Curated annotation (Swiss-Prot):
Keywords assigned: Amidation, Cleavage on pair of basic residues, Disulfide bond, Knottin, Neurotoxin, Secreted, Signal, Toxin
GO terms for cellular component: extracellular region
Keyword Secreted: yes
Cystine pairs: C51-C63, C55-C72, C62-C76
This protein's name: Conotoxin TsMSGL-12
Compartments, record wording: Secreted
Known tissue expression: Expressed by the venom duct.
Signal peptide: 1-24
Propeptide: 25-44
Organism name: Conus tessulatus (Tessellate cone)
Record-linked InterPro entries: Conotoxin
Family named by the database record: Belongs to the conotoxin O3 superfamily.
Length: 78
């Protein structure tokens, strides 16, 4: 095989390795984001039982707490 052919094959191999590494990094970042979302939700759910009961009595949704008091609304934004 000529020197030019070897260089082309080597370049293609490096390009393949670089794109595979990028894809793995993106997948890992996506998994990390999913874990962070799960952690946030579990923390929020634990403290919201009292808020949910308080707002359910008023036929509204619990939107979190403001200054330690449950904040209820028909629809929660953010």
């Amino acid at each position: 095989m000529s020197g030019l052919g070897i260089m082309v094959l080597t370049l293609l191999l490096f390009m393949f390795m670089a794109t595979s590494h990028q894809d793995a990094g993106e997948k890992q970042a996506t998994q990390r984001d999913a874990i962070n979302v799960r952690r946030r939700r579990s923390i929020t759910r634990r403290g919201d039982e009292e808020c949910n009961e308080y707002c359910d009595d008023r036929n509204k949704e619990c939107c979190g707490r403001t200054n330690g008091h449950p904040r209820c609304a028909n629809v929660c934004f953010g």
